[in-house]
Amino acid sequence: MKPYQPVVASLLNQLRPATILDAPSGSGWLKGLLGFETRMDGLDLFARPPATYGVFRNVDLDLGLPDDLGLYEAIVCCEGIEHFGNPALFFKTAREHLVPGGQLIVTTPNVWYPEARLQFFLRGFFPSFPCLVGRIERGTHMHIMPWSFAHLYLFLRLNGFEKITLHDIDEPKPKRFYERLLGFPQALYCRHKRAKSLTEEERIFWSFAGSAQSIHGRRLVVSAETPNPAVQVTLRDKAAQRP
C-alpha cells in the first residue's frame, strides 16, 4: 500500500460521504479501504471499470469533468493532477460537481523537498518529472506539472475552494540527513512569514507551508471544501445575535 492511500481512506471514513467520484480511479483500490456504504463512481482514461463502482467512464480528465455528471459529496483525485496540462479546468469543474460543503481530496508528488530542489538546481528537472523529448504523446502517463503545497493552494483558492488543509503522511521527514540542513532556511523563512501574518488565512497557510510534510515530504495529500452558504448564513445570524 502506498503511504498516501490510508490517509485518503481515513479522511473519507471520517466524512462518510454518501456519493464519491474517484477521478482518476486507477485500479479502484479506494472502495476497498472504506468502512461504510457509499455510491462510488469512477473516471479514468486507461483503466477498466472496477467491479464495485457504479457509473464508470473512460474520460480524458485534462478536459475537465464531463458536464453531465451529477453532484457529489466528495471528489477524490489521487496521483492525477501531475498529468494534467490544464489543472485549473479540472479544479473548476470539480467545484461545479460538488455539493455546497463538499470535499475535494487531492494527492500528488511534492517537489519542495530539498533533494528535489537540489536535483532541479543541478539538472533543471525535478525527480519524477524528467525531460520527455522523444516520448511526448498526449494521453500517456506523463508527469508534466510539478506541484508544491503553495502551488496547489493557489489553484484551489483561484477556483473558490476553502478550508485548504495539508495532511500528514507516515513517511520519513526528512528522508536523508543532509536534507535537514538544506531545508532549514526554508523552514525559517516560513516561520518568519507566519509570525508576520496579518490575517488568519495567511497564518494558516504559512503553518502548512512550513510544516515537515510540506518541506520534507515526498507526497502531498490536500483536502479542500466548497463554500456552504447555509453555514455562512448561520454564522452571520449567530454573530448578529451577540450582545
Predicted regions and their residues:
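Glycine-rich phosphate-binding loop signature in dinucleotide/nucleotide-binding domains
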Residues: Q14-R16, D67-G70
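A conserved beta-strand element that flanks and buttresses the S-adenosyl-L-methionine
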Residues: V76
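Conserved acidic residues
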Residues: A18, G54, E73
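A short His-aromatic
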Residues: E79-H83
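S-adenosyl-L-methionine-dependent methyltransferase catalytic module, highlighting the catalytic core
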Residues: K2, P6, W29, G85-E96, ...
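Conserved alpha-helix/loop element of class I SAM-dependent methyltransferases that forms part
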Residues: M1-P17
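Conserved class I S-adenosyl-L-methionine
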Residues: P17-G26
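Class I SAM-dependent methyltransferase SAM/SAH-binding core
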Residues: S25-G64
